Amino acid sequence: MKQYTATANDDGVRLSRFVQSVTRDFPTSLLYKSFRNKRVKVNGKKAAPEYRLQAGDLIELYINDEFFPPEGAKPAPKAAPKRQPKQPKVTVIYEDENIAVLYKPTHLLCHSDRTGDANLVDAFTQYLAEKGEYDPHGENRFKPGICNRLDRGTEGLVIAAKSYAALRDMNEIIRNDLLKKEYYTITVGVPQSGRFTAWWEHVEKNNKVSIHAHQSQDERRKQIITDVDVLRTAGPFALCKIGLVTGRTHQIRAHLAYLGRPVLGDIKYGNRKMNERTGTKTQALCAVRISFLEISEESTLHYLSGKVIKLKDPQIVKQFDALDKNKAEPDKGASHAEN
């Protein structure tokens, strides 16, 4: 029999998931058989697989030792990339006991991928480990994670969670649309200010999205709504504030391209000639503001209600200031503002 005491990072974790995290090569069929046969108990009583743990719960597992790692053994590591990159120092914009809001620079991945390049999750984990807030070797049930991702070529604010409860509740906030994000972008051509609607469709073949004026007959497309506010203009360019009413993959980049005013530097959806003429090699898009609406009092993150977090002096404004107004003229494009 093995005993465990639920920690703060286990708070809210489904019991079946906890059991899977502390066992090794334990078949799912045996997992649920153990629950039926009362071989999994919490605080001395039979517990269901869907039970949500609370910090301090005593978990007793009457499971054969062969399904547990040897005493003192570290959790089996995930397959490591061929090279171990040096993780960058994280820039913290806001931090409390549950979350941190980080600045992600252009070209830094949010999550690890097969390239093995540095990424924000590992950099944040290293940051917490150095502060003594996380033990990567002693904790095998939770790893700090980020709650909203940005494309590799996009810079700006990213929310990171320090605990499972914070990650769970922040994801719930995002699902319930209680988190609003604003971006700055530089467009090729000056768009109209206003609210724009269209229909979004993902094209798996080339990992792009296509934007359309109407829903498809098979109703596979999803409606997108994007707010555009032109802040400044400089010849053929505009510095715009973008608000996302909906949040789809590549929504800002693809929607602005559909409107004929693509993001400067965007390789996938942008104006290649203008990118080359200006020497812009990455998309001019930055997440600059996060604001929270009213959050349920039951949430561990209720205290964030009404809070606004901003990126001060974003680099994209300096990039706009430096643009040469006379380098090129934009391609003509139609605008589809909603009246």
Language model segments and positions:
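RNA pseudouridine synthases
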Residues: 1-339
